Regions:
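N-terminal amphipathic alpha-helix/helix-capping segment at the start of soluble metabolic enzymes
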Residues: 2-50, 169, 310-314, 338-390, ...
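Intrinsically disordered, low-complexity terminal tails and inter-domain linkers enriched
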Residues: 6-12, 311-341, 465-508
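Structural preference for beta-strand elements that scaffold enzyme active sites
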Residues: 45-49, 76-78, 103-107, 126-128, ...
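Conserved, mostly hydrophobic/aromatic
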Residues: 48, 109, 177, 220, ...
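Short, acidic/polar
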Residues: 57-67, 114-117, 267-271, 395, ...
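Active-site beta->alpha loop and helix N-cap motifs at the rims of alpha/beta catalytic domains
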Residues: 74-205, 381-389, 393-470, 504-547
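Glycine-rich phosphate-binding active-site loops on the catalytic face of alpha/beta enzymes
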Residues: 75, 126-140, 279-291, 596-609, ...
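Catalytic alpha/beta core domains of metabolic enzymes, predominantly
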Residues: 145-157, 189-317, 335-352, 358, ...
Length: 727
């Protein structure tokens, strides 16, 4: 096979390596491709899609579900075609939809069966193929290849894959080359490992084969259930494509995200991070729910960034000479103005201190439970709460029991509360940090567990007074930082009037912890050099696309070897709880996924405190920076599913949701499990009607277990490993 690439000379590398600009939001300019009557990429809006969960052979049910999906906001609808029978029935589904007046482009989802893909490509507007299982194998074998043998394997795949490419070219059918982290072939795994690089190379092999056939009507995806892996893979894909003169549109999605708020937050972390990078031309949010509930979530995420484009932020060309668009033209580059005010700090290319392709937490020196190797803390703003009633703290994870005069702490107990200038009329739980404005803190008679937060101006004044011998109120160097854990075990008790005593927890001039609130877009540069070793920064931004500002600030700290801990703060005016959670997950998740942030603070005065607290812990869980509950990796269901995924997921959750830190995969069929659940500790996978196979990691423990006894046998496996806890 001779590989050729589009003509046009050497491509221009993106300023941000994987995105047009690290300082401002602007979209990566992709080639426009045609999917039926509805093009994707180029200057088109972000397209929304989902996938049916009906049996593809049930024409009427599939048509009616497709119509519901269209009405919920889907631009495209994907339907599974696991065999020739289902592929052939796509014609009947399409005919019925057209007769009812629905011209929605249909996408055939193919795994394992090239003949079904070739049939579907003649019938529908687009086919999705998985390079990990289209012509390769997955047996979890470690294979060794010489360079000659590896090339021979590529030649074999080329011969098996190119008939589909030729059919797509003949019929005007688009193709998605969709890599899944969990279904990388043994060949790729053996050569590149279970890595984002392996995911990228798996797709690039197929892209090059398509280009060898002069077929360019492609879009690409890099899906994983692990948000860190997913984000890294997409970024690496774009950088790799640009180096080879490619700019294919991207299909974004976090696979097996789960259900409910957890699934939405996890999807928003992964998809939102990439949208903030300017990447993404179509979105599918994978929830273990009916597919019509997915499109509104995807639409809400896309809308946050499309508003930015309407306000003047455009797209930038990926290369000086991009491959021609679908109509043969080359789109012109747009120089976006950006929405946010310019930060005093800008990034010129990817700095040496920061890699967007691997997770490395920013190095900080711990102050009490903040920073270092400790999990990020959660800070809640409770100024607007009823500070005469201790019961409101249940929303923050502290349940007050009047008869016992005690607090019981849940696994979602926040670490700090921001009081501002407000004073409570009751004793807060021992160990719960209280943060007051500096002027209010100075007047407190009892400063136990109470810490000041300074404005930039106040801090510089105090530091100057301290250095001049004026005796700053709080900033005298401490003899040592206090230590106590960032998270509390469920069921722990605290008396509201008899707090646990920790060494040195009185905030006096001889102790350390204090906070300095800084605006990422406007702060005195001299402030950073004045920071005391016991200071913690609260970094906020009012910019719509504040991720770029906050990231630039933290990279600046890295470059100047300033290892001060930092809490990320964002303000939200929304009154819609669902939109708030999605926005916060996208904004904070993007930074936490890159290793930035030692805590988070979400200020949302119109959102219930319990929602803010749950979202905060959910974001940390989704970014895998702080685990506070059981994690479920459950697929969104499709026509291949062998049991009711929604019902089964809820049933398993009800029995296991107290197993903090355990990851359980629930997979409807063998396509994504066991591969996609390789990140899980345990797996529950449908392998036949009424039959379940149970896994410990990648290892099959029990095959073909009858469904009624499968959960109890899974619990037995967890118990054997010493990981079971009675409720």
């Amino acid at each position: 096979m001779t590989q050729t690439f589009p003509e046009g000379g050497s491509p221009q590398v993106l300023a941000g390596g994987y995105c047009p600009d690290l300082n401002h939001y602007s979209r990566f300019l992709t080639r426009e491709i045609q999917i039926g009557h509805l093009p994707m990429g180029g200057s088109n809006p972000i397209r929304i899609q989902s996938m049916t969960t009906t049996d593809t052979m049930d024409t009427l049910a599939t048509v009616e579900q497709t119509i519901r999906m269209v009405h919920s906001g889907c631009d495209y609808v994907r339907i599974t075609a696991p065999s020739m029978r289902e592929a052939e029935n796509l014609a009947a589904i399409k005919k019925e939809l057209r007769q009812r007046g629905y011209a929605v482009p249909l996408i055939a989802d193919i795994h394992f069966t090239p003949n079904a893909a070739e049939m579907a490509a003649r019938l529908v507007e687009k086919v999705r193929v998985n390079p990990g299982n289209y012509a390769d194998k997955k047996r979890f074998e470690n294979l060794e290849y010489t360079a000659t043998a590896y090339q021979a394997e590529l030649e074999r795949i080329y011969k098996k894959f190119t008939p589909l490419v030729k059919i797509c070219k003949e019929y005007g059918t688009a193709m998605r080359i969709g890599t899944n982290h969990g279904s990388l072939s043994d060949r790729i795994m053996s050569h590149y490992g279970d890595t984002p690089r392996g995911m990228v190379e798996s797709a690039m092999e197929f892209i090059r084969m398509c280009e060898d056939q002069q077929f360019y009507n492609l879009c690409i995806s890099m899906k994983a259930s692990n948000t860190q892996v997913m984000v890294q893979a997409y970024r690496l894909l774009v950088e790799t494509m640009v180096k080879e003169g490619m700019n294919y549109p991207l299909h974004l999605g976090v696979t097996e995200a789960g259900d409910g708020e957890d699934g939405r937050i996890k999807s928003a972390v992964g998809i939102g991070t990439l949208l903030a990078d300017g990447l993404g031309d179509t979105i599918r949010v994978s929830l273990t729910e009916d597919p019509e509930f997915e499109a509104p979530v995807a639409r809400a995420l896309a809308a946050r960034y499309e508003k930015g484009e309407a306000a003047g932020v455009g797209r930038r060309a990926a290369a000086a000479n991009n491959p021609a668009a679908a109509d043969g033209s080359t789109p012109a580059a747009v120089n976006p103005s950006g929405l946010a005010a310019d930060s005093p700090i800008t990034l010129k290319g990817i700095p040496a201190t920061y890699s967007p392709y691997t997770y490395t937490r920013r190095i900080t020196q711990p102050v009490q439970q903040i920073g270092g190797h400790q999990p990020p803390v959660v800070m809640l703003d409770i100024q607007a709460q009823n500070l005469k009633d201790p019961y409101f703290l249940a929303a923050a994870g502290y349940q007050y029991h009047a008869l016992l005069d005690k607090y019981t702490l849940s696994d979602l107990a926040c670490d700090f509360v921001y009081m501002g200038e407000q004073l409570p009329s009751f004793a807060l739980p021992g160990g719960l940090g209280q943060i007051y404005r500096y002027t209010t803190w100075r007047g407190l008679a009892n400063k136990q567990y109470c810490y000041p937060v300074y404005s930039a101006a106040e801090y510089l004044t105090e530091r100057t007074a301290d250095e001049n011998g004026g005796g700053g109120e709080h900033l005298t160097p401490a003899g040592g930082a206090e230590q106590h854990p960032a998270a509390y075990a469920g069921g722990a008790e605290q008396h509201p009037g008899e707090a646990t005593q920790y060494p040195g927890t009185h905030a006096t001039p001889q102790t350390g912890l204090h906070f300095v609130e800084i605006d990422a877009a406007d702060f005195p540069q001299a402030l950073l050099q004045q920071l005391h070793p016991s200071a913690v920064i609260i970094l906020h931004t009012a910019a719509q696309f504040g991720i770029q500002q906050q990231r630039a600030f933290m990279v600046h700290l890295q470059e100047n070897k300033l290892e001060v801990p930092l809490i990320l703060k964002r303000n939200y005016s929304e009154s819609d709880a669902a939109l708030f959670s999605l926005g916060a997950a996208a904004d904070l998740g993007a930074l936490l996924t890159d290793g930035f942030g030692d805590g988070i603070c979400l200020d949302a005065p119109h959102i219930p405190l319990q929602t803010i607290n749950a979202s905060s812990f959910g974001i940390l869980q989704a970014t895998r920076t702080r685990i506070s509950k059981t994690e479920y990796i459950s697929c969104p269901s499709c026509g291949r599913t062998l049991f009711d995924l929604q019902e089964t997921t809820q049933y398993i959750r009800a029995k296991t949701d107290h197993l903090k830190g355990i990851k359980i995969a629930i997979m409807g069929c063998i396509v994504n499990g066991p591969g996609e659940m390789a990140d899980a500790d345990y797996g529950y996978v449908g392998t036949g009607p009424g039959k379940i196979t149970l896994y410990r990691g990648k290892e099959v423990v029990k095959k073909n277990v009858d469904t009624p006894s499968a959960l109890s046998e899974l619990i037995d496996i967890i118990r054997e490993d010493g990981n079971w806890i009675e409720k």
